[in-house]
Amino acid sequence: MTDKTSLSYKDAGVDIDAGNALVDRIKGVVKKTRRSEVMGGLGGFGALCALPQKYREPVLVSGTDGVGTKLRLAMDLKRHDAIGIDLVAMCVNDLVVQGAEPLFFLDYYATGKLDVDTAASVINGIAEGCLQSGCALVGGETAEMPGMYHGEDYDVAGFCVGVVEKSEIIDGSRVAEGDVLIALGSSGPHSNGYSLVRKIIDVSGCDPQTTLLEGKPLADHLLEPTRIYVKSVLELIENIDVHAIAHLTGGGFWENIPRVLPENTQAVINESSWQWPAIFTWLRTAGNVSRHEMYRAFNCGVGMVIALSAPEADKALALLNEKGENAWKIGIIKASDSEQRVVIE
């Protein structure tokens, strides 16, 4: 009989002990996100969550997203602390625009070789995002897959479920001529347009860690976490009759605002109502990007656009600004049968 070397899972590149060490590292921060509806703790085959009792006809709203190639920039710069916030933001902001309160969140973290410090940093960010949005982090999957990813490169995906009263779903159907559009300021490019961002960095030859913009490194502007609007928007919805909300993600103004507009309406955006944050001016100049392309690839300083009746506008602005948002009137809704659903003038 020929002697054979005894192989283990670790020999194949999967370190179960590292995975267990990660779970031990994150238990504390995950526990802080717990909601009263969550049943049980980490470690079950599935996470259990009851519906809040205040809903008469609860409708579940679900969403999933990632952070795109912002992740590549974060890995290149070895800055992982905000990626988790981005991940949660991209999911919960999509839920709240339909009037939904986020209930619970799950994450998927995949890598070629698990680095416990990096993964813990990302998941700490996820927990922070859940705290900011009032959402429970109920579970996740950490997949160490040698040969699937280069070295310690990783990818993340998030999954979120929220709930809304059936009669209070916001779907844009009540948007009408004369409605006022209110903008909520963004914290930067959020998590969209980063393939173009990275191309601009490459073509311009700049070093984002040493290139300064408004007194701080370009990298700080680009890796600023996506703003989470959940608590401000839920309070707005509770006090104001909101007709529609658009989350400005991939596709920018041109593609996201029309998603919440009824037929025969047009959003007219007043470009002079705000000044682009410096990072967008830099991207446009460094990349020689056209105005139209800027509004398609980036949010240009606007994270959400909210439609409501004109008499409610001032009250809404006061509430949002009191909650810490940078909110302003950005435009109006006009009746139009034009194929151009958004006009920026």
Swiss-Prot record:
Q: Which domain of life is it from?
A: Bacteria
Which keywords label this protein?
ATP-binding, Cytoplasm, Ligase, Nucleotide-binding, Purine biosynthesis
Which Pfam families does this one have?
AIRS, AIRS_C
Name the chemical reaction catalysed here.
Answer: 2-formamido-N(1)-(5-O-phospho-beta-D-ribosyl)acetamidine + ATP = 5-amino-1-(5-phospho-beta-D-ribosyl)imidazole + ADP + phosphate + H(+)
Give the EC number(s) under which this enzyme is classified: 6.3.3.1
One of the record's GO molecular function terms: phosphoribosylformylglycinamidine cyclo-ligase activity
Provide GO CC annotations from the record. Answer: cytosol
Primary subcellular site in the record, as a coarse category: cytoplasm
UniProt pathway annotation? Purine metabolism; IMP biosynthesis via de novo pathway; 5-amino-1-(5-phospho-D-ribosyl)imidazole from N(2)-formyl-N(1)-(5-phospho-D-ribosyl)glycinamide: step 2/2
Any one Gene Ontology BP term: 'de novo' IMP biosynthetic process
InterPro entries hit by this protein: PurM-like_C_dom, PurM-like_C_sf, PurM-like_N, PurM-like_N_sf, PurM_cligase
From the Swiss-Prot or TrEMBL record, state where the protein is found: Cytoplasm
Q: Which PANTHER family match?
A: TRIFUNCTIONAL PURINE BIOSYNTHETIC PROTEIN ADENOSINE-3, TRIFUNCTIONAL PURINE BIOSYNTHETIC PROTEIN ADENOSINE-3-RELATED
Check the record and name the HAMAP family matching this protein.
Answer: AIRS
Q: Which family does it belong to?
A: Belongs to the AIR synthase family.
What is the protein name given in its UniProt record?
Answer: Phosphoribosylformylglycinamidine cyclo-ligase
